[in-house]
Amino acid sequence: MPELVDWRRDPAVARGARGATSKEWATHVHELWRVLARLDADDYDEDEDGKDVAGDAEAARTTSSRIRLPYPAVVPGERFRETYYWDTYWIVLGLLTSEMPATALGVTNNLLYMVTTYGFVPNGARVYYLNRSQPPLLSSCVSAVYEATRDAEWLRQALPLLVQEYAYLTRSERTITVRDTESGEVHALSRYFANTTRPRPESYREDVEVARRATRRLEDAVAKLDVKRKIYRHLASAAESGFDFSSRWLADGKNLETIHTCDMIPADLNGFMLRVETDIARLAREALVSLPVSEDEIYAERVYLNHLLEKFTRASEVRRRAIDAVLWDDDTKRWRDVTFEPLVGEDARAVVRDVGELVFACETPYVSDFTPLWCGALDAGSERAYEVVEALRTSKLVTAKGIATSLVESGQQWDWPNAWAPSTHMLVEAIQLYAPREEKYAKELAHSWLRTAYQAWKSTGFMHEKYDVCDDADSVGKGGEYVPQRGFGWTNGVTLRLLEQYGFPDDSVNCVE
């Protein structure tokens, strides 16, 4: 089993457990970091055809599509045998909860390395992922690691790479410009936009089949090819969103051939972008404070950091207004995805749409509608923040076994009845930070998810990628392109973090401490 330099038995989250149940569970989950560790670029089990190449570094290098990373990695598990972008944030939180700051630093440095190499963080550490990214949480990883290590020199080295990634995220093809006809203000908002018009290599047959269904009634070869290319981009862009797949992206809410991801302005993505902007401004301020006062040689760095502080403070204020003007639905007290009608032959970089041309995408709520609260779209303790929490409470997404992703039964994995670790953590923390009078509700949400994950672990012996809020047997989530996965990186991270913050629930029928 691979050894991580800072892995120790009996971490604080297990030592501090109030009962035998939580101690046993936390200890097991902590052990899984060693199972999911990949210590170096040659730590591969098999090549792309499934041939065993363990111990054969040359075979691994020449047959694998993996991107070689400089530091030990912690992977999600099973079919996901390499680093994935947004998974890494919750893995980092779990590693820090396990008192493993060196490993957390390393997996974050792997993401920074990919920015240095490619100008952005790809979806995952595979060469075929270089045409898309994932929800941008690199700045959140850097923030978490810096908070744990207080390594100011490392932070100052990381900041320019966060700025470099931001330049990629705000490229013109990823930006939709919207004019508020009442105020006259022009807003720049983000969309997912993969740089490909071909099937995804990792899901080639599935994508080809979706494109075939989408074009089966077309006879003109040119028109058919055009539709297929758009479908492939929409599919890859949905994969970039992390919600692959969900009825969110489907025009009819059920069939993949109606996917139109690039024709949408997602509420959660723009929340994430706000968080990036806020993070960079705050981290620039932290870096400024860390600089020596009297050394002349750091003058240029001080000027640069002041520039970042001013630029990204302003950018976050502009983004906040844009989210409020375009994505907030005052009737439902939540943010919502909006759609726009693509123009034939349009160059998205040159089009300014009036806000009246945009339409809210889905009537029913999605867990992603509430993500902007976690990202700081509202002031902490504000009346509107509490209205958002009440909207979540009455949304029917919240069940006794966790927070469902949506109310739509589409058969896709990011829909009813699946509950996911990252969504749960974001909402629990959002309530903690922005609606502190609802701390009891945050604890209830954390405990409902912990009970479900624990039940599945006791029933199956594994931690899982997602959970079914309706399944009274083993609660393992299902649906989507592949069979349920075990491991599982971000589930382990959220479990440890919530156990540390809230302890194990005492009121579960089968899980009494």
Could you tell me what each predicted segment is?
Residues 140-191:
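Acidic/aromatic-lined carbohydrate-recognition and catalytic surfaces
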Residues 84-114, 368-380, 424-437:
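Alpha-helical support elements that line or immediately flank enzyme active sites
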Residues 1-82, 106-125, 179-264, 322-419, ...:
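Extended glycan-interaction surfaces of carbohydrate-active proteins
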Residues 115-158:
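Aromatic/His-enriched, Gly/Pro-containing loop or helix-boundary segments
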Residues 87, 103, 107-110, 134-137, ...:
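Amphipathic, well-ordered alpha-helical segments in soluble domains
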Residues 100-111, 151-170, 276, 290-324, ...:
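Extended, well-ordered alpha-helical scaffold segments
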Residues 93-97, 140-147, 275-286, 374-377, ...:
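Short glycine/serine- and small hydrophobic-enriched flexible loop segments
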Residues 260-287, 413-436:
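Long, repeat-rich segments with strong aromatic
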